């Protein structure tokens, strides 16, 4: 690759994915051949940590190169403002064409009334049909908002056109078999070909094929899964036997040594208590889960990951088909992890445990990162947002680092 040609950038991103769901990070049961190949051909980060284990703060940090204390998105529900440039805006200024497909979540989803958020359900419920462009520096946007059975926006509207019964098929009452009772865990009746994961892959491929070839590109393919609900379609929902899954990490009496909000969440009386009190959501607190239910939750999570891996494989095949491999940086990561029973907790929140803080991160850059036989090359990075955005801005065709946090 010529050093004076700006490389393309393809950012493959998931939501709430544990690093131990990938073969390249030591899981010997889950099938993730496409992502594992990225690690074998590039660099696998072993100490890549999130600055905040919630979606909006973590995503704002990745896109701005700032910590939550600087960009202001300290928790979910706080919109990212325009005071700081995003990496997409910096790259546009450096001559890049930019596109985002899938989940962005830089605006709040659950505003009470329209006008606060382009991504909010309230706006889409009163007639919004597109995202105003450019959106945080992205010149093209195909957005998926929400998760699985609770989705709205462009993906949900596309699904209603091609599969009118799709929304109903995703609901737990239409599960393919009786659920185990684990939190938000069931076998989705939605056909895999119209699942959001495959829609993100299809739209990403379409964007790559129709890109502005006169400019290098920055394309984000952001899968809303494997965030809960843990409801993959066939064949992924039955791909892994819960009895083969390792139990969560728990120590007897450990909650007794932790601050009170840990036990309150465990019992369903603290963080997220409104969801646990709403019986229509079938949201069980962690204390109500059995060992087999934790394993069943993880088995479904693995199924979601393999569905994503198949989608990643399709995208990477098109990168090769279009002759883009040698001049394209491919990055795979997630916004944060998930606890899934570790330390008696599920989901993710104000608990600083490895399961939700230490995440997968893989970079493939032909000609810059050596590839060859043997195990993946490892690198260390103790916090994600600033080093990643700075390195990207330094390396990609002279995009200036102005506005990026240097701490």
What is each of the regions a protein language model found here?
Residues 1-407:
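Formylglycine-dependent sulfatase
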């Amino acid at each position: 690759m010529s050093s004076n040609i700006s490389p393309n950038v393809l950012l493959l991103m998931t939501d709430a994915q544990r690093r131990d769901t990938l073969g390249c990070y030591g899981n010997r049961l889950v099938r993730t051949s496409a992502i594992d190949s990225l690690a074998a051909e590039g660099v696998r980060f072993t100490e890549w940590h999130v600055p905040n284990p919630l979606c909006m703060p973590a995503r704002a940090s990745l896109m701005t190169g700032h910590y939550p204390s600087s960009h202001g998105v300290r928790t979910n529900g706080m919109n990212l403002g325009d005071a700081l440039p995003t990496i997409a805006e910096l790259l546009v200024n450096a001559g890049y064409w930019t596109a985002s497909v899938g989940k962005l979540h830089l605006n709040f989803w659950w505003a009470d009334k329209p006008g606060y958020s382009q991504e909010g359900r309230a706006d889409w419920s009163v007639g919004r049909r597109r995202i105003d462009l450019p959106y945080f520096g992205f010149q093209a946007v195909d957005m998926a908002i929400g998760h699985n059975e609770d989705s709205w926006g462009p993906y949900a509207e596309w699904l209603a056109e091609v599969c009118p019964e799709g929304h109903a098929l995703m609901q737990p009452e239409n599960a393919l078999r009786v659920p185990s009772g684990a939190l938000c865990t069931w076998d989705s009746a939605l056909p895999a070909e119209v699942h959001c994961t495959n829609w993100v892959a299809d739209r990403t491929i379409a964007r790559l094929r129709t890109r502005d070839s006169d400019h290098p590109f920055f394309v984000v393919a952001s899968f809303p899964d494997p965030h809960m609900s843990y409801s993959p379609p066939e064949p992924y929902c039955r791909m892994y036997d819960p009895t083969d899954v390792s139990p969560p990490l728990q120590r007897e009496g450990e909650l007794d040594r932790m601050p009170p909000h840990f036990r309150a969440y465990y019992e369903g009386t603290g963080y997220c208590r409104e969801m646990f009190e709403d019986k229509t959501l079938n949201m069980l607190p962690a204390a109500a889960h059995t060992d087999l239910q934790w394993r069943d939750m993880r088995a479904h999570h693995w199924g979601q990951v393999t569905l994503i891996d198949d989608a990643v494989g399709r995208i990477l095949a098109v990168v090769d088909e279009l002759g883009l491999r040698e001049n394209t940086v491919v990055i795979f990561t997630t916004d944060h992890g998930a606890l899934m029973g570790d330390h008696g907790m599920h989901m993710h929140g104000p608990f600083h445990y490895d399961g939700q803080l230490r995440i997968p991160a893989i970079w493939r850059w032909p000609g810059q990162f050596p590839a060859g036989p043997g195990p993946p090359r490892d690198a260390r990075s103790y916090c994600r947002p600033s080093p990643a955005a700075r390195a990207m801005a330094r390396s990609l065709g002279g995009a200036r680092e102005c506005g990026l946090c240097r701490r």
